[in-house]
């Protein structure tokens, strides 16, 4: 019975992975269709506008409010205040 249960869990994991990938792919913007070389000027203008929008979506930076990581790094590593490390051999009552 055990090997059959392991196979079922494996198949369920594969199906779940495929479903997750499909959901992720739906959220990705689609590339605009090329109207062709003989298209009117208005359609080419719409295509280039849609292509510019698509490229801006794909290549935008996703850093949030602060895009400069140099400012953020020291605060994360050291904090704003200097931390005094206390040895466990230092007795606060004796000093």
Swiss-Prot record:
Modified residues (Tyrosine amide): 63
Gene Ontology cellular-component annotations: extracellular space
Entry-linked Gene3D superfamilies: 6.10.250.900
Entry GO MF terms: neuropeptide hormone activity; neuropeptide Y receptor binding
Disulfide bonds: none
Transmembrane regions: none
Compartment annotation: Secreted
Claim: Signal is one of the keywords in the record: yes
Biological process per Gene Ontology, one example term: feeding behavior
Keywords per UniProt: Amidation, Cleavage on pair of basic residues, Neuropeptide, Secreted, Signal
Tagged with keyword Secreted: yes
Signal peptide limits: 1-27
Domain of life: Eukaryota
Chain coiled-coil ranges: none
InterPro entries with a match to the protein in the record: Pancreatic_hormone-like, Pancreatic_hormone-like_CS
Function: NPY is implicated in the control of feeding and in secretion of gonadotrophin-release hormone.
Similarity section: Belongs to the NPY family.
Protein name per its UniProtKB record: Pro-neuropeptide Y
Organism: Ictalurus punctatus
Lineage, broadest ranks: Eukaryota, Metazoa, Chordata, Craniata, Vertebrata
Gene: npy
